[in-house]
């Protein structure tokens, strides 16, 4: 395909070392899709004859059928998916197949393939995210009154509902979905027609190709179009943030499944046992998702490092962009598939959650707020409650178990109505505002969540 310039054959090791067909054959369907659109545009612009284009398209469709049937013979000697497809096309249709590459370079061809492939994968990932979030809304709806400790510094802080906690997960994932939807807009720009780097001398019409391929825009500068991979980096960045959120969720599930917490159980099908300890039920799926987050972070660093020193325009370095991107997509997709099945099937241990909430003086802030409403300055109220907690620790009881007389020794602003504010249910109900953990607020948040998800349907 380019041997005319050279006086000796490429070394066999170099040919194998520089070939990408071992991995970029994954683009085959998208490569053929792009070629069919390109050929159609060449016909519409009277650059190729209609009969030639019809022959080329028929040949490309046969190549695709062979690939999908597993009958295609991939050749390292042909370097990449593009030349393998073109070579087979020429075998099928003859010399007319050599006309396909008119007005095109592999530089804009591969950039188009990546964008077509990544656009499709992004849509699949968004659909998985929506499925996962829908499952979380269903889970939260079942547990708007299920009380558990809310934590700061992994210490009991204030009572919340399990449903409220699940809705925090939902909000994380919703922002992740927004990021991917936004990244898709920049993925969905067409580089085809930029040729090697400067455009082509043929009178092409890029709008025809863009419309045929479903691109919402056209890359405006040929140098930039063939050489930048920021759209892939942006996707991988959004994927990394998403995996970070899933890693945090995994960490909580792992902790909560431990005997020391015993807050939740997940179905056995998401766990494994031990080869030596028969009692073990190991949370392998969340542990693996937590570990796989590091893998996606690494692929982001790979792509950033790959691009950081490249001058314009295309360089062979960019051959190394595909495997990190493939691995990122595969890792993220697998993690989402696991989570979409696992998370909605979490079963909380309500009794243990409630008992844990009672152990940590979780209503201390409620007592302080009560005092403030009765005219005590907050800093003074803070000290009063600290003294009451110290007494509770000494007596080995919760604040709600102290007598009225015991509480009143710290402040005469405490009346017999104080116990309404020291119950766990009262604490939840008191936080009755947008974003609060009151059961009716969580129910409203769930309803809003269902409406918000419709945007991505």
Swiss-Prot record:
UniProt-listed Enzyme Commission number(s): 4.3.2.1
Subcellular location: Cytoplasm
Reactions this protein catalyses: 2-(N(omega)-L-arginino)succinate = fumarate + L-arginine
GO biological process, one term: L-arginine biosynthetic process
Record CDD domains: Argininosuccinate_lyase
Record pathway: Amino-acid biosynthesis; L-arginine biosynthesis; L-arginine from L-ornithine and carbamoyl phosphate: step 3/3
Chief place of localization: cytoplasm
Keyword annotations: Amino-acid biosynthesis, Arginine biosynthesis, Cytoplasm, Lyase
Keyword Lyase: yes
GO CC terms: cytosol
MF GO annotations: argininosuccinate lyase activity
Family statement: Belongs to the lyase 1 family. Argininosuccinate lyase subfamily.
Protein name: Argininosuccinate lyase
Gene name, Swiss-Prot/TrEMBL: argH
């Amino acid at each position: 395909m380019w041997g005319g310039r050279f006086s000796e054959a490429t070394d066999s090791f170099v040919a194998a070392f520089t070939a990408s067909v071992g991995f970029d054959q994954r683009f085959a369907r998208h490569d053929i899709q792009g070629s069919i659109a390109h050929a159609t545009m060449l016909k519409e612009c009277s650059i190729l004859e209609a009969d030639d284009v019809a022959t080329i398209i028929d040949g490309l469709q046969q190549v695709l059928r062979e690939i999908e049937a597993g009958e295609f013979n991939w050749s390292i000697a042909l370097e990449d998916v593009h030349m393998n497809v073109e070579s087979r096309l020429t075998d099928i249709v003859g010399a007319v197949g050599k006309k396909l590459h008119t007005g095109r370079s592999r530089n804009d061809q591969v950039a188009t393939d990546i964008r077509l492939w990544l656009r499709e994968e992004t849509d699949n990932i968004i659909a998985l995210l929506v499925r996962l979030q829908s499952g979380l809304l269903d889970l939260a709806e079942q547990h708007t009154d299920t009380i558990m400790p809310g934590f700061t510094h992994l210490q009991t802080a204030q009572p919340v509902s399990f449903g409220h906690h699940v809705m925090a997960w939902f909000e994380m994932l919703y922002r992740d979905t927004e990021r991917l939807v936004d990244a898709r807009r920049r993925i969905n720009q067409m580089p085809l027609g930029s040729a090697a780097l400067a455009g082509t001398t043929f009178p092409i019409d890029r709008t025809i190709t863009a419309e045929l391929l479903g691109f919402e825009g056209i890359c405006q500068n040929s140098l930039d179009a063939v050489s930048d991979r920021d759209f892939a980096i942006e996707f991988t960045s959004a994927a990394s943030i998403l995996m970070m959120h899933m890693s945090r969720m995994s960490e909580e599930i792992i902790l909560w499944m431990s005997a020391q917490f015993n807050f939740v159980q997940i179905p056995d099908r998401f766990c494994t046992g031990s080869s030596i300890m028969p009692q073990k039920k190991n949370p392998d799926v969340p542990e693996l998702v937590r570990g796989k987050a590091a893998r996606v972070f690494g692929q982001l660093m790979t792509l950033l490092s790959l691009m950081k020193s490249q001058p314009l325009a295309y360089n062979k370095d960019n051959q190394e962009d595909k495997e990190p991107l493939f691995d990122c997509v595969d890792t993220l997709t697998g993690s989402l598939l696991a989570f979409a099945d696992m998370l909605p099937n979490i079963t909380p241990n309500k009794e243990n959650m409630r008992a844990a909430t009672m152990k940590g003086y979780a209503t201390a802030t409620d007592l302080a707020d009560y005092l403030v409403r009765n005219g005590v300055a907050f800093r003074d109220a803070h000290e009063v409650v600290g003294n009451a907690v110290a007494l509770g620790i000494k007596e080995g009881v919760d604040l709600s178990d102290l007598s009225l007389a015991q509480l009143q020794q710290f402040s005469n602003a405490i009346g017999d109505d104080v116990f309404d504010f020291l119950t766990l249910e009262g604490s939840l109900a008191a936080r009755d505002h947008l974003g609060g953990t009151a059961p009716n607020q969580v129910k409203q948040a769930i309803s809003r969540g269902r409406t918000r998800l419709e945007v991505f349907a």
